[in-house]
Amino acid sequence: ANVRSKNVGTITLETDAIMLAEAVVVAEAPQVQVVEDTLMYSSSAYRTPEGAMLEELVKKLPGAEIDDDGNVTINGKELKKIMVDGKEFFGGDIKTGLKNLPVDIIDKLKTYDKKSDLARITGIDDGEEETVLDLTIKKGMNKGWFGNADVAYGTEDRYMARMMVNYIVDKTQFSLIGSANNVNDQGFSGGGGGPRWRRNNGLVATKTLGANFATETSKLELDGSVRYDYKGADIISTNSSERFLQNGSSYSNSNAVNKNKNSDVFANFRLEWKPDSMTNIIFRPNFSYGKTNGTSGSESGTFNSDPYSLIANPNDFLDFDKLEDDPLENIRVNATNDASLTKSKSISTSATLQLNRKLNNRGRNITFRGRFSYGDNDNDQYRQSETRYYQILNALGGDSVLYRNQYITTPTNNYNYSAQVTYSEPIARATFLQFSYQFQYKYSESDKTTFDMLDYPEWDINGPLPSGYESHAVDSLGKYAEYRYYNHDASVSLRFIREKYQLSAGMSFQPQHSVLSYKRGDY
């Protein structure tokens, strides 16, 4: 008992381990993180259906809302662009990104206020920020080729097909998207100068094909996109209504068929060149072309008593070609049959050039910005209608009839340009005196002419215009407008830029001048 230690030699122990089947550590990914002025969302924290697009994920983000037109707001701020790994995706187009970027490739989402090109380059905040959604691609999917495709077919010949192919290596990105469906899924933003239709109206078929690229070197950044969109909408509507008047009720019934086709081509590019450490040049050209064809036909009638008290379906007796045995003859007030055709073509182009030269490394710099845009639209409408007034007799004692046969053309064009020079001088630490001058000019012109085609009873709105129609212009229906706008803006401001706040004080001088020339009819 008094022995403090004793050497017993080497003791060998046999192995008797138990192998566990598995060990699982479960943790919930944080839904949102705040880093300075950036909100960061983890894609894995939100459940979405397999094969879902970005739109489904954005709907689940806290504070995010998507309206019926596809506009996105996050915490009350409207989203202006979608970016992929810091680069604009299809020019930053919101709806194209929402409909074509699969959730499976997204690791994180960041929302922040992106500074303007001028603020980013000069380091002097000009207050022109835009809220963007920047997506980070998952590791393993940001190198080489990857893509996805979905195809579906259902009853009544409903179909949907969508594909996306991506190539990412180093600082180069390339994306190819394509889709087609007739299930009212628009899949793109639309554009051009023709009429627009809401995505839930009628039977809508859409097709889109586009390519997006981005690449950069130490001195040059280049990105752009080209996209073709097609949208066809067939809308058939039937309406019955009753109006309550002081002396009784008025009843109206109508049928309408509308078919519209719209094709658009968009091209957006951005070039940023840094020939040396003190010079930066940014050039952004854009182009779009749109073409629209629309046909519509309608039949309507007004009655002084309820037509349903006489027949089961009064809408079957609105077409003038079906009134030989008219069961509603005694209660008719008036009726109209109308057919129209609309054609339009639009082209628009714009370009922005910014040149910045740093004069030292303390914030002294001079910047030139120039912008030009041009738009041209040709809109033609052909209309034929016949209105019968059953309670107003003509000179022969029969029903009065009003015929309309018109060709309406409305060409419009506009252009504007601006030039701005800005000089910044550092006068203290993070304090700048800024001088700026800008000149802006806008011009627009519209000339509406209506031609009476009643002297051409054989003319069909789907055929070519008859010879000599130009002499049948109706002066009283003509409209002409021309607008010119001139603006000068000279300003001086003092900017204080601190880590937690910014302060700007200044004054500006803005002489403006505008001229409007308007002519309607013969006046």
Segment roles from a protein language model:
Residues E88-K115, R162, D170-S175:
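Short acidic/polar hinge/loop motifs at secondary-structure boundaries
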Residues T38-L61, D69, T73-I74, V84-F89, ...:
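Short, polar/charged loop or turn motifs at beta-strand boundaries
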Residues G51, E55, V103, Y159, ...:
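Amphipathic alpha-helical transducer elements in NTP-driven molecular machines
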Residues A17, I66, V103, M141-K143:
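Short flexible coil/turn linkers enriched for glycine and charged/polar residues
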Residues N2-R47, E55, D67-D69, N75-L79, ...:
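Short, acidic, small-residue-rich periplasmic hinge/interaction motif at the N-terminus
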Residues G92, K115-D157, K171-Y523:
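Primarily recognizes Gram-negative and organellar outer-membrane beta-barrels
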Residues E55-F90, D107-K108, L118-G127, L133-K138:
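Extracytoplasmic beta-strand/coil segments of soluble accessory domains associated
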